[in-house]
Curated annotation (Swiss-Prot):
This is Protein Wnt-6. Disulfide bonds join 83-98. A lipid is attached at residue 1 (O-palmitoleoyl serine). GO terms for biological process: animal organ development; canonical Wnt signaling pathway; cell fate commitment; neuron differentiation. It comes from Thunnus thynnus.
Length: 117
């Protein structure tokens, strides 16, 4: 009597944080392009920029200024938003307040902690 070994292989998705980090890296390195005359070629806008490959993110139009309210784009702007003065990401005051400055305010929250002694 013979025996068979069954082996199953599959691809596993990376952790969500890793996917986000990779996308952010590509977003930060995105290249502005315009279409070539042949309708197939993408030409980088600017000097000393390498042509994009299949892994690069590209764009053809500049993003609107989300710092200011704009009915056309649906942006409410960032004026009056709460920010984190110690954060270095998009929730940080330096980025969110668009270099307009900000006012610091201390807020104290009281809540039941459901502690047991």
């Amino acid at each position: 009597s013979g025996s068979c070994t069954l082996r199953t292989c599959w691809k596993k998705m990376p952790h969500f944080r890793e996917v986000g980090d990779r996308l952010l890296e590509r977003f930060n390195g995105a290249s502005k392009v315009m279409g070539g005359n042949d309708g197939k070629t993408l030409i980088p806008v600017g000097q000393n920029i390498k042509p994009p490959d299949k892994q690069d993110l590209i764009y053809s139009d500049e993003s609107p200024d989300f710092c200011l309210a704009n009915r056309k784009t649906g942006s409410l702007g960032t004026r009056g938003r709460m920010c984190n003065s110690t954060a270095m990401d998009i929730s940080g005051c330096d980025l969110l307040c668009c270099e307009r400055g900000y006012r610091e305010e201390s807020v104290v929250f009281e809540e039941n902690c459901l502690c047991r002694f």
